[in-house]
Amino acid sequence: MARSGYTLPVFACAAAIAALQHLKNLQAELDPIEGPLHSVTLDLINPPQTVEIAIEQVAKLGPGTALAISRSDPGDNLDITRNTPIWAVVTWAEDQQLDSIVIEGGEGIGRLSSTNDRAAIYAYAQHLLQTNLQKLLNSTEKIRVTIILPEGRSLAQRTSNAAFGIVDGLSLLGTSGISQPLSAPEQLEQFQTQLQQKAEQRKHLVFCLGENGLDLAQKLGIDTACLIKTANWIGPMLVAASLEGVEGILLLGYHGKLIKLAGGIFHTHHYVADARQEILTAYAATLGLPQTDLNVVFNSPTTEAALQHLRHLDQTTGSQWVAQIYTELVRQIDQRSQTYIQSQTNHRVIIGSILFDQQRQIIVSSPGGTALREQVTMA
């Protein structure tokens, strides 16, 4: 059985707790010994459980400042952050600081290019840090927390972060503290078990490939009881949903991933098949995009870059290429997904799709996607 681990925000939080505890001990004149601090406990919040996280080192850096170091352990997941160190620097803040806890991203934490280079520390990580650290503060104490990933900048070069507008480092992303081994065969069984449980309560579900989709879904007000994480197993999950009697499925995903379904590719890992530019170019060609622009789309380094070219073309010429091409893409995604399900189960399931860009802005929603979104949105 594959071993689960913890997500990056958990280790950042553990290091911050250790650094704050060190400061509290200094403040109480307990004269703590600097060096290894075996572990700290923290509340994951999601799921609601307390865990113990190892701490490698803790030390005083200066007056009112301490540093603690943890190390990432994502379990058996194929994760590039395995064993990477996570630093947290905690400093007593001045009285004029309005908030009791201010969280900042230091070296190796990515910046969101779309939001004035704000640190890529997302909602779950913020909530995790705020909740666990607040428990250690009295009503008058204030701290400033800086999270540092010494290897973050170099590790980010091996990710698709840039496609989501995250530059210069990694993000503290996720909606859960548990890191499941997405690449292990057992993971598909876990996804299908979760689907079976939710299908007993809901007849309309939302499939999200990863954390970006799950995060956007919650911001859109979609009922979390309808959310299913599929990773790259879209085909098997569509079939499983059909066999469980699900009546409608909303596919919510990054256009650079879901576009593969328009080409009949139902396992979306790039090691299996990566024809994103070819699919986008083919649909653009059938709709009459000029040859010069087809060449640009085909040779773009990412689907995001190709989308930006089409948007620029629309802005400068008054054309509607983005709307035309992406409307056809979601139509085909819906149709091919329904055909795929029927070929495997002989059942008919309503499919709708919504594609978003790197800034998590919706590009297009199919008619089915719009209708299903209404079905799964909380009142």
Curated annotation (Swiss-Prot):
Any single Pfam family the record assigns to this protein: CbiD
Enzyme class per UniProt: transferase
Metabolic or biological pathway, per its Swiss-Prot or TrEMBL entry: Cofactor biosynthesis; adenosylcobalamin biosynthesis; cob(II)yrinate a,c-diamide from sirohydrochlorin (anaerobic route): step 6/10
Documented EC number(s): 2.1.1.195
Gene3D superfamilies: CbiD-like
Catalysed reactions listed for this entry: Co-precorrin-5B + S-adenosyl-L-methionine = Co-precorrin-6A + S-adenosyl-L-homocysteine
GO biological process, one term: anaerobic cobalamin biosynthetic process
One Gene Ontology MF term: cobalt-precorrin-5B C1-methyltransferase activity
Keyword vocabulary terms for this entry: Cobalamin biosynthesis, Methyltransferase, S-adenosyl-L-methionine, Transferase
Family statement: Belongs to the CbiD family.
HAMAP family: CbiD (MF_00787)
PANTHER family per UniProt: COBALT-PRECORRIN-5B C(1)-METHYLTRANSFERASE
NCBIfam families, per the entry: cbiD
Protein's name according to its UniProt entry: Cobalt-precorrin-5B C(1)-methyltransferase
Protein species of origin: Cyanothece sp. (strain PCC 7425 / ATCC 29141)
This protein's encoding gene: cbiD
